[in-house]
Amino acid sequence: MARYFRRRKFCRFTAENVVEIDYKDIATLKNYITESGKIVPSRITGTRAKYQRQLARAIKRARYLALLPYTDNHQ
């Protein structure tokens, strides 16, 4: 019987001592949205609740300012 070892989830923002998540940092924000444009939940990414709220706020601001798309490319 094969045993599967899951990688331990950790909060990247806590590890890097991030104070505030910036909405202009598009490269970081893109890691936390799906291909369809949805925000990935913290139970998948391992992000702490404090940073998940900041992340959601930053993604929504970036979408509003057209830095990130609301949805994927419709084809």
Curated annotation (Swiss-Prot):
Cysteines engaged in disulfide bonds, as pairs: none
Hydrolase in keyword set: no
Coiled-coil segments: none
Role, per record: Binds as a heterodimer with protein bS6 to the central domain of the 16S rRNA, where it helps stabilize the platform of the 30S subunit.
HAMAP family membership: Ribosomal_bS18
Protein family: Belongs to the bacterial ribosomal protein bS18 family.
Protein's recorded name: Small ribosomal subunit protein bS18
Natural source organism: Actinobacillus succinogenes (strain ATCC 55618 / DSM 22257 / CCUG 43843 / 130Z)
Upper classification of the organism: Bacteria, Pseudomonadati, Pseudomonadota, Gammaproteobacteria, Pasteurellales
